[in-house]
Amino acid sequence: MWGPMTDLKTTAGKIEDLDAKLAESRAPLGEGEPAARTRVTQLLDEGSFVETDALARHRSTDFGREHDRPYTDGVVTGYGSIDGRRVCVFSQDGEIFDGTMGEVYAEKLTKVYDLAIKTGVPIIGIYESTGPRVQEGIVTMAGYARLMARVSQASGLIPQISVIAGNTSGIAAFAPTFADVLVVTQGTALHQAASHVAGAEPETFGGAAAHAESGTAHLVASDDKQALSLVRDVLAYLPANNRAEAPRVEAGSVADFDLNAVIPDTAAQAYDMSDVIKAVVDEGSFFELSAEAAQNILTGFAYIDGRAVGIVANQPLALAGALDSAAAEKAARFVRTCDAFNTPIVEFVDSPGFVPTPDEERAGLLRRASKFAYAQAEASVGKLTVITRKAIGPAYVFMGAKDLGADLVYAWPTAEIAVTQASQASLAIYGSEDMEEEMDELFLHPYAAAERGLADNVIEPTATRHYLVEGLRLLERKAVAQVPKKHGTV
C-alpha cells in the first residue's frame, strides 16, 4: 500500500514505495518474518540470498480473493550460495492460504526450476503445502503438472534436494520424492491421502519414521536447524550438475582399525560392514543415506583420498547380508544417482544371495532386483568392488561383478566366490550333503575367480585403501562409448 505522504511523481517517492512493498513481501501477513523465509536465510551463506519474484501476487478475483493478495503468493524463491557454491532454492510458506498452491505460486516454482536447469546449479526445495488452492480452480492442477515436468527434466541434470519442513499432503506430496535426497523433519507429515480418508493421524502413516523405514526419506532431522545442516552436508558430496566432476577435497587421515582381524573365523558369525567402510574411507567422511530402510544393504557417500565416492555394501548384521527386493531397489536408485553425477562407486560384498521366501517373490523380487542389475550395468562411472567374504550365486553377479561392468575387482583371502553354498554344491553334484567339506575346499575361496580374471587381485585386507586409491586415480580417465538409444525400460 502507498503511504499517505508518498509522492510517486518523484524518484525518492518511487524508491520509498518500492521499499514499502519489499518490506511487506518479507512479512506478508504483517506478523514478522515467516518460517519459510527464515529457513532460506539459515540454509544459505550469510548475505548471499537473492530473491526472485518477491512482488508476485495471485490474479484471482473469485470468492473475494481480489481483496487478499499477499506478496510472494506463499512461496519464497531465489538463489544464493552454500559454502560458496551457487544454488537455487524455494521455500513454501504454510501460513499463507494454508500453504496451498495457486497459479502464480506454480509459475514461481517453474521459473526457479528453469533458472536452476539453465545455469546448471543444484536446487533445494523446502516443502510445506497442503495441496492445490481450490478457489483458483483447475489451473492449480496444471501448475502441479508443470512442476512435475520440471522436476523430471531436472532429474539427472542437477542435484535436487527436498526438505519436508511442515505438513505436505495431497498432490503436493509427490514432487519432493523426485529428489536425489529427501530430508524429513520429525513432527511433520508427507502423504497423498487425507487423514480422514486414511483413518489415522497423518504422522502415523506419513511421518518421518514411516518414510525412513520405507526408503522414501533418505535422512531424518529432529528440527529445521538439523534438516538444513544435513542439506549443506550432503551437498558437499555432489557436483553442480551432470557435466561437472564429483567434488574433491584435501585427502583425510585414516581410522585406526585392523582390517586383517575383521572377518570372523566362523562363517556363520556376523560383523559390521560399516567398520570396514570407515577403515577404508577418509576418516569421518562416510555419510550414510537411507539407514533405516533395507538395513541389509548400506548406501552413502564418502571421500577416499579426497575424492567423493558412492558406497554400496552388504551388511552381514542384517539378514546375513542377503539381498531382498527392498535392498535391491534401494541400491539401484543410489547407483543411478552416483552415475548421473559422475561419482565413482565402491562396493563391499558379503552376501549369500537373495532371500528365498514366497513373501519376497510376491513382493516383486524379480522385477525389483532387475532394476539393481540394470543400474549396475548401465553405470559408466568408475566402479570398484571389494569382496570381503561371501559372493555366492546371484549375489556375486548383482554386487559389482566384473562382467556386469565393474572395472576393478579385489578379493580378500577370506572371500568365498562360488555358484552356491558348499552344502548345495554337494547336493547338486553328489545327490547328498556328505561332501560339503570337500566342496568347501574346492569352491569357497577367491582363487578360482582370480585364475579366471574375475577378480583382478587377491589382497590383504589392510591393503584395501591403497588399491582403491590407485584404482580411483586410474579411473579418472575412464571413457565409455554408449550405444545410442532413447532410454532403457527397466
What are these regions (language model features)?
Residues M1-V490:
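Ligand-binding clefts of soluble mixed alpha/beta catalytic domains
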